[in-house]
Amino acid sequence: MKRADLSHPRVFNDPEWAEGYYKRNAKDIERVGKRFVKLLRNSGFESGRILDTGCGFGAVAIELAKEFPDIEIAGIDLGEPLLQLGQSLAGKAGVADRIAFSKGDVHELDFESNSFDVVVNTFMVHIVDAPVSMLNEMERVAKNQGRIMITDLRRMWLGLIVRKLRTAFTLEEGMEIIRKSDLRQGKYSKGPFWWDYMVGT
């Protein structure tokens, strides 16, 4: 199946569109957050600094903050309406004091090298202009013994029914992007609609 063009902008600057995106996708992304929590717990993680690259409305960051009280999270995104929504949702969840949302480009992270214990990325590889550049930046800011957690949609036959799956990469295409990047050795896996690449979990 040929990869389709995105049906939405790469950067969500329209407040109404951002609100609609949240309503359509909140539950799915919250489930990713819960899955990341489980993986981190199983790997022995308890505290530290986490960076959510392309955090959107903050669903993953909020799930992590709720489950790990001794962490600090930085969430970056270029979409200001999504960041504002994330701040509001974090406040309602009682974790706004531990998540710092800010506008930032995943291709040029404004953080020092070797500065985060965990770097996460959710459904962004197929959206950004230069995924290899984004992954290289994630590797740069992750600590030498840090964890890197990536999940993205997977193009497969269900894309005939679910259009957003047609815009994603296949598992093989995703792994080729990983191989072209500076990311350290990790583990590949796939779920019904997604693929994962995990380092240190």
Where are the model-predicted features located?
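Conserved class I S-adenosyl-L-methionine
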Residues: M1-G44
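C-terminal alpha-helical "lid/dimerization" subdomain adjacent to the S-adenosyl-L-methionine
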Residues: A4, M149-G200
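Class I SAM-dependent methyltransferase SAM/SAH-binding core
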Residues: L51, F57-E108
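A conserved beta-strand element that flanks and buttresses the S-adenosyl-L-methionine
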Residues: V120
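Short catalytic micro-motifs in class I SAM-dependent methyltransferases
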Residues: F123-M124
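A short glycine-rich, Lys/Arg-flanked "PGG" loop and its adjoining helix->strand segment in the class I
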Residues: V132-N144
